Amino acid sequence: MSCKVLEELEEVIRRRIEEGNPESYTYRLYSSGIPHIARKVGEEAVEAAVAAIAEGRERLAEEAADLLYHLLVLLNAAGLSLRDVCNVLEKRRK
């Protein structure tokens, strides 16, 4: 399974965190800590669920993109990567 844009997004997230620019939303989110990031992931998951029920496919895709972005930031903050998640999925597939 491969999704190049997610790998590229993960790299952008890493770079923005390393740069430490306080004007960067990614850096500010990362700096807020895991509990705050986890709440954002929860909020985005709820928004995606609502979009699936009541707002249509296009809106669901947009909310899913937001959810994936925030999840990648959370994974980074926890010392994990998209590769770590893919490894788990590959093991479960067998």
Curated annotation (Swiss-Prot):
Catalytic EC class: hydrolase
GO cellular component: cytoplasm
Keywords of this entry: Amino-acid biosynthesis, ATP-binding, Cytoplasm, Histidine biosynthesis, Hydrolase, Nucleotide-binding
Pathway: Amino-acid biosynthesis; L-histidine biosynthesis; L-histidine from 5-phospho-alpha-D-ribose 1-diphosphate: step 2/9
GO biological process: L-histidine biosynthetic process
Coiled coil spans: none
Main location: cytoplasm
Catalytic activity, reaction form: 1-(5-phospho-beta-D-ribosyl)-ATP + H2O = 1-(5-phospho-beta-D-ribosyl)-5'-AMP + diphosphate + H(+)
Compartments it resides in: Cytoplasm
A GO molecular-function annotation: phosphoribosyl-ATP diphosphatase activity
Domain of life from the UniProt record: Archaea
InterPro entries (alphabetical): HisE, PRib-ATP_PPHydrolase-like
Keyword Metal-binding among UniProt keywords: no
Pfam families: PRA-PH (PF01503)
Keyword Nucleotide-binding applies: yes
EC number: 3.6.1.31
Protein family: Belongs to the PRA-PH family.
Listed NCBIfam families: histidine_hisI (TIGR03188)
Protein name in the entry: Phosphoribosyl-ATP pyrophosphatase
